[in-house]
Regions:
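RNase H-like (RuvC/DEDD) metal-dependent nuclease/polynucleotide-processing core
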Residues: 1-3, 8-244
Length: 244
């Protein structure tokens, strides 16, 4: 069986595919539809992108609120509010922020706007491909790392010590960890795929593979949006509780 972890990158989508027999593959896809076309028969595709969006209203997705509570400072800040669905179809940041403000009472951060197109891609895929809803599920890398390590990461993933911290967590779970960045670097430049993109996609793939018998989720009972998409973040490892 194939287990796929995916993270957005400057070149599109960076995917790590792992097999139970030890085989692995890394690849960049220009769009999520191409990724789905290749990996639609995978056991699971775990992706770092909001799935399931509110149409409006002042209440945030429960998974976002609970993920921040679980991570605690400073990692809680890595979980930003998901936009409402109408905002992701806007033609500009100003328009998107105005729509989000009108529909939810909150403006839109530039960070969220920078991935709006990717959120839209995944939303459209899941709304048009019912089979994808069974396999494509949302993760947040920091939740996955916390679940494996038993604590939130202490250092930023943008710093060398943070990348080392996360690599060590992955190595404790998956012996093939060192080979994945090597494979990625032999095929893609840093300006196409950043090192933290590689680690985030890898922790998603490892989560899918190790959690093949079942994954935990935040919240424990998933919410569904108005279109029937789950609003949750899945993980594998220790039971997740509030940050200490």
């Amino acid at each position: 069986m194939r287990y796929v972890g995916v993270d957005g990158c400057k070149a599109g989508w960076f995917a790590v595919m792992l097999r139970g027999d030890g085989d692995r593959e890394v690849e960049v896809f220009a769009d999520v539809s191409s990724l789905w076309k290749k990996h639609s028969s995978a056991a699971a595709i775990l992706i770092d992108i909001p799935i399931g969006l509110r149409e409006g209203g002042h209440e945030e997705r429960k998974c976002d609120r609970e993920a921040r509570r679980v991570l605690g400072p400073p990692r809680a800040s890595s979980v930003f509010p998901a936009p409402c669905r109408p905002a992701i179809h806007a033609g500009s940041y100003r328009e998107a922020s105005d729509i989000n403000k009108r529909m939810t009472g909150r403006g839109l951060s530039l960070q969220t706007w920078s991935i709006a197109r990717k959120i839209c891609e995944v939303d459209e895929l899941l709304l048009s491909e019912r089979a994808a809803r069974l396999r494509v599920r949302e993760i947040h890398p920091e939740i996955c790392f916390r679940a494996f390590a038993g604590h939130s990461m202490r250092h930023s993933k943008k710093r060398a010590e943070g990348r080392l911290e996360r690599t060590r967590v992955l190595e404790s779970i998956y012996s093939g960890t060192p080979g994945v960045p090597e494979d990625a670097r032999s095929a893609y430049r840093c300006r196409e795929v950043a090192t933290d993109d590689i680690l985030d996609a890898l922790v998603a793939a490892v989560t899918a593979m190790v959690g093949r018998e079942g994954l935990g989720s935040i919240p424990e009972t998933a919410e569904f949006d108005s279109r029937g998409l789950r609003m949750e973040m899945v993980y594998c490892g220790r039971d997740i509780g509030p940050a200490h």
